[in-house]
C-alpha cells in the first residue's frame, strides 16, 4: 500500500535547480534512507512533502488519515516552556479530547433524554480513545522516553531556551516518539546525540513497525536501520532496494556501465562524423554520408553527469609549539554550577585526543574553558608557548547574510578573488554555492565554509567540537585523512567512533569527571 506518492517533482532556488521531474513512493513498512552529498536537496525534499515548501511543479499525495511526524532541527522551541511542557505537548490532541469530555459532563444535567443519549455515546468514544492512547499514564510515558534519551539528566523542569543544540535535538526527538505518528521523517537525528543514545535510537528504529524516511550521513547507523535507499544526485532521485552497502555496490556497477557505454558511443560518433566529413562532397559516396548523418541526428546521446567537487581538506602546520599544549590544575568547569570534579590534565605536543561522553556533561564547556572563552569556577588552565590555535565550534548562531566569498575574504583580506574561490572549491563547494549567502546553504555546506577558514591558516593545535555533524560521506573521509596527516595536536569532540578511533592516540571519557548523574 502506497503511503506517499510524489510525481514529476521539479524545484529550484533561483537559477540553482534541485530536482528535475523526479518521482518517489513510500510503501507501508518501508524504512527509507535518503542519501546524497551536501546541498543535493534532502532537507528540501522533506520540507516539500510536509507542505512547508511549495514545489515549482509536481504532485505530492499522502494516503488519507496518515499522521506524519517530522524531526526538523530548525524547529524553534517556545520560550518559557520546560522540557516537560514540550514533551507533554505531544499529547495535545488528547488533552483537547479531555476538555471536550469535561464540557460534556458539565452539560449532562441540562440535557434532554435525546441529547443525553448522543452525549453519552460521544463520551464513551472519547473515553475509549483516551484509554487506548494511554492518556492516564502520560507522565509515566514521558519519564520513560526522557530517560531513554538522557533528558532526565538535564532536568525536565529546565527552560528549553537554555538548551544546547544536542539537548534541543533530544527534546524534539523525544516529543516526536511520544506522538507515535504513522510515519516518521527524521532529518539527521544522530547529530549531537552521544553514542549511548544513538544506540538506543538504532534499536528503536530497527523494531519500528511503521514506515520512516531517514536522512543521515552516519553510515553505520543508517545501514543497520533501513531497507530502501533513495539516492539524490544531479537533480535525480533513484530508488535502490537493500541497505547502504548494497546501494554502493549497485551504484558503482551502474556508473561503470554508463561510462563504458558513453566511451563506446563517443567513439562511434567520432567515426560517423569523420565519415560524413570525408564523403558528403563526393557524388559516389554522398548517399552513404547522408545515411550516416541521419543516424547521428537520431542518436540518443548519452550524457555523463558533472562530477561534484570532492573536498580536499589539508591543515597547514605552523611553527613548533612548546612541549605542553596546556596543563590544568584542579580545574572545575561550569557556568552557574560545577560540571566537573577538580581536573588536573595535560596535553603534549603532537598528541591527538578524543573527548567522549554523554551530552550535557561538559565536553564543550571544557574546550571553552581551555581556550579562556568562559571563566573556570575554580582552578587554573595554563596554555603552552607558541600556540597557533584553530577552533571549530559546534554551533554558530546568527543569520549570516554574507556570501561565501565575502566570508572568506573577511578572514583573509590579502587573498585574491581567484584564491578565495579556489580555497572554497577545495572544500567541496560549487560555483553556485560560493556565490550564495551562507544562511541559504545546507548545514553541511556551512560547515565546509567554516572548515575552509580553518585549513587556510597556520595552526599547531586544533580544537574541534563535533566537526562531522552535517558533513556528507566524502567530506568526512577527507577530514579524517586531513587529521591523520596533520602534524599538530588535536583535541576532538565526536560521537562517531568509526571517525575518531583511527585518528587519536587517546580517548578521554568525560563521564568519569562529571559531577552530573548519568
Predicted features, each with a name:
Residues 1-260, 309, 318-518:
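ABC ATP-binding cassette signature C-motif
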Residues 250-305:
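Intracellular alpha-helical coupling/juxtamembrane segments of multi-pass membrane proteins
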Residues 313-315:
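Post-kinase regulatory C-tail/linker adjacent to protein kinase catalytic domains
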Amino acid at each position: 500500500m502506497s503511503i506517499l506518492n510524489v510525481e514529476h517533482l521539479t524545484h529550484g532556488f533561483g537559477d540553482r535547480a534541485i530536482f528535475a521531474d523526479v518521482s518517489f513512493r513510500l510503501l507501508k513498512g518501508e524504512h527509507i534512507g535518503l542519501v546524497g552529498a551536501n546541498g543535493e536537496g534532502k532537507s528540501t525534499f522533506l520540507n516539500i512533502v510536509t507542505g512547508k515548501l511549495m514545489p515549482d511543479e509536481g504532485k505530492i499525495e499522502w494516503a488519507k488519515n496518515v499522521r506524519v511526524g517530522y524531526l526538523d532541527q530548525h524547529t524553534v522551541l517556545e520560550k518559557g516552556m520546560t522540557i516537560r511542557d514540550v514533551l507533554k505537548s505531544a499529547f495535545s490532541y488528547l488533552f483537547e479530547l479531555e476538555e471536550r469530555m469535561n464540557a460534556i459532563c458539565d452539560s449532562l444535567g441540562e440535557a434532554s433524554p435525546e441529547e443525553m443519549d448522543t452525549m453519552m455515546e460521544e463520551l464513551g468514544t472519547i473515553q475509549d480513545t483516551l484509554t487506548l492512547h494511554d492518556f492516564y499514564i502520560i507522565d509515566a510515558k514521558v519519564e520513560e522516553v526522557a530517560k531513554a534519551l538522557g533528558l532526565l539528566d538535564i532536568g525536565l523542569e529546565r527552560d528549553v531556551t537554555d538548551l544546547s543544540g544536542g539537548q534541543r535535538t533530544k527534546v524534539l526527538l523525544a516529543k516526536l516518539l511520544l506522538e507515535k505518528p504513522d510515519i516518521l521523517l527524521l532529518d539527521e537525528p544522530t547529530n549531537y546525540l552521544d553514542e549511548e543514545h544513538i544506540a538506543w535510537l538504532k534499536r528503536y528504529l530497527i523494531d519500528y513497525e511503521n514506515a520512516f524516511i531517514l536522512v543521515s550521513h552516519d553510515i553505520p547507523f543508517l545501514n543497520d536501520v533501513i531497507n530502501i535507499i533513495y539516492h539524490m544526485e544531479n537533480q535525480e532521485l533513484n530508488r535502490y532496494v537493500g541497505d547502504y552497502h548494497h546501494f554502493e555496490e549497485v551504484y558503482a556497477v551502474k556508473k561503470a556501465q554508463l561510462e563504458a557505454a558513453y566511451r563506446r558511443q563517443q567513439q562511434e560518433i567520432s567515426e560517423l562524423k569523420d565519415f560524413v566529413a570525408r564523403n558528403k562532397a563526393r557524388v559516389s559516396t554522398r548517399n552513404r554520408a547522408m545515411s550516416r548523418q541521419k543516424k547521428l541526428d537520431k542518436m540518443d546521446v548519452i550524457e555523463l553527469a558533472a562530477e561534484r567537487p570532492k573536498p580536499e581538506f589539508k591543515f597547514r602546520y605552523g611553527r613548533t609549539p612548546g612541549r605542553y599544549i596546556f596543563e590544568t590544575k584542579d580545574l572545575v568547569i561550569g557556568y552557574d554550577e560545577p560540571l566537573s570534579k577538580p581536573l588536573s590534565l595535560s596535553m603534549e605536543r603532537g598528541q591527538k585526543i578524543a573527548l567522549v561522553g554523554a551530552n550535557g556533561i561538559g565536553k564543550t564547556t571544557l574546550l571553552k574553558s581551555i581556550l579562556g572563552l568562559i571563566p573556570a569556577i575554580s582552578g587554573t588552565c595554563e596554555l603552552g608557548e607558541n600556540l597557533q590555535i584553530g577552533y571549530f565550534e559546534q554551533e554558530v548562531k546568527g543569520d549570516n547574510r554574507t556570501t561565501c566569498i565575502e566570508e572568506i575574504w573577511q578572514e583573509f583580506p590579502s587573498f585574491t578573488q581567484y584564491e578565495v574561490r579556489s580555497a572554497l572549491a577545495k572544500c567541496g563547494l560549487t560555483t553556485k554555492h560560493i556565490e550564495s549567502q551562507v544562511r541559504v546553504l545546507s548545514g553541511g555546506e556551512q560547515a565546509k565554509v567554516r572548515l575552509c577558514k580553518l585549513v587556510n591558516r597556520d595552526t599547531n593545535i586544533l580544537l574541534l567540537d563535533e566537526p562531522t555533524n552535517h558533513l556528507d560521506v566524502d567530506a568526512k573521509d577527507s577530514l579524517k585523512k586531513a587529521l591523520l596527516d596533520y602534524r599538530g595536536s588535536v583535541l576532538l569532540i565526536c560521537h562517531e567512533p568509526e571517525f575518531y578511533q583511527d585518528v587519536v592516540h587517546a580517548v578521554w571519557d568525560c563521564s568519569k569527571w562529571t559531577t552530573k548523574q548519568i
